[in-house]
């Protein structure tokens, strides 16, 4: 089968959950003998090769561009440029493909592929990691820009397609947008260690691992750890990640007097992240917007429970079984989150053992392989 994967980023040149998903999908497809083209924006130096299995044909549909503003929000120009590049590529080569599989975001590539689908004869498969609410669109882009964004998202939903979501939250929202086609919820994005780690005695460390963008609410996490540290002797915080909110993180550490308690180490490699997850008392997820919440599963694989903040745009709460593999902080304030951290401390080894059992019991459902299998089946329907 001839498959064209469409996403403006490619792992590891850009790091994120969707990036890993499309890279894993591409490499699984070529391993199974399929012909794969990965259509993306160039993220590597001119003249260099993209870092991916050499059997995957990588095609640049646009130049190297900064995708984010200084504040951490997506720039408007790159999606437009990429959308035009996708349209031109499919206009030339669309008949070569049996399937075009794209991410819904950043929307314009999907809108570019839509009118060519009946002309070129390819099937269109779309991943919806998130479906933004009206209130979030307006907060993100303002009243006028938010309304335009909302209409663009709705137009994408009305395109005939085979859709996949990664949470019930966003599948429900997609149906409410009157999706033009079937939608399946994929539960598995985890491609790490297959055997659950034996839970070890935790150090009194709260771990935060994420790209430092406004949606992750890093200063709220610092304030919560400050309150929890007043109730848990020897508690420390470890922040792994970089991004536009780094200066705000450093300032919050000083503001709360946590210089000797909280460490911001920046980007961490896979081995460092693994070691920190294994020793942490809990993983802290203060994000107000998540399409899945893979870090919850990654922590659970090491026997580490998670504290997740409730929110109307946060699908990571679907991965938490209260008191089994973590807890949900019901309100976006330091007191509520600190209380959740204290609950994890008081649960001690019992919560680590139940987290390991939860992961073992759900591994098949949460595995990347389970989702890849369903996607491959959809290509033939």
Which residues does each predicted region cover?
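A charged, aromatic-enriched C-terminal amphipathic alpha-helix characteristic of glycosyltransferases
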Residues: 346-380
């Amino acid at each position: 089968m001839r498959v064209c994967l469409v996403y403006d980023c490619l792992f590891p040149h850009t790091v994120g959950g969707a990036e890993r998903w499309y890279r894993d999908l591409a490499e699984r497809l070529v391993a199974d003998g399929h012909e794969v083209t990965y259509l993306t924006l160039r993220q590597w130096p001119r003249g260099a090769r993209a870092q991916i299995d050499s059997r995957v044909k990588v095609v640049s549909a646009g130049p190297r561009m900064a995708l984010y503003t200084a504040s951490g929000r997506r720039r408007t120009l790159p999606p437009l440029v990429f959308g035009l590049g996708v349209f031109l590529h499919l206009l030339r080569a669309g008949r070569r493909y049996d399937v075009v599989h794209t991410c819904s975001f950043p929307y314009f590539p999907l809108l570019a592929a839509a009118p060519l689908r009946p002309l070129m004869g390819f099937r269109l498969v779309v991943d919806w990691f998130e479906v933004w609410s009206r209130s979030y669109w307006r907060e993100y882009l303002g009243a006028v820009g938010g309304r335009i964004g909302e209409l663009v998202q709705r137009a994408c939903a009305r395109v005939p397609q085979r859709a996949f979501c990664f949470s019930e939250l966003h599948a429900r929202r997609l149906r409410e947008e009157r999706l033009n086609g079937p939608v399946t919820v994929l539960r598995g994005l985890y491609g790490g260690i297959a055997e659950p780690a034996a839970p070890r005695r935790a150090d009194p460390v709260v771990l935060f691992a994420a790209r430092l963008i406004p949606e992750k609410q890093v200063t709220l996490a610092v304030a919560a750890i400050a309150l929890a540290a007043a109730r848990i002797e020897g508690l420390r915080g470890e922040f792994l990640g970089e991004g536009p909110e780094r200066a705000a993180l450093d300032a919050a550490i000083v503001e709360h007097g946590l210089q000797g308690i909280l460490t911001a180490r920046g980007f961490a490699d896979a081995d460092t992240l693994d070691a920190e997850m294994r020793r942490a008392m809990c993983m802290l997820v203060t994000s107000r917007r998540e399409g899945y919440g893979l870090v919850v599963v990654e922590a659970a694989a090491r026997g580490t429970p998670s504290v997740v903040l409730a929110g109307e745009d946060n699908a990571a709460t679907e991965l938490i079984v209260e008191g089994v593999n973590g807890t949900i902080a019901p309100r976006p304030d330091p007191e509520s989150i600190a209380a959740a951290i204290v609950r994890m401390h008081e649960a001690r080894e019992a919560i680590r053992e139940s987290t390991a059992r939860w992961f073992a019991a759900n591994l098949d459902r949460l595995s990347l392989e389970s989702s890849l299998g369903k996607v491959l089946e959809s290509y033939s329907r």
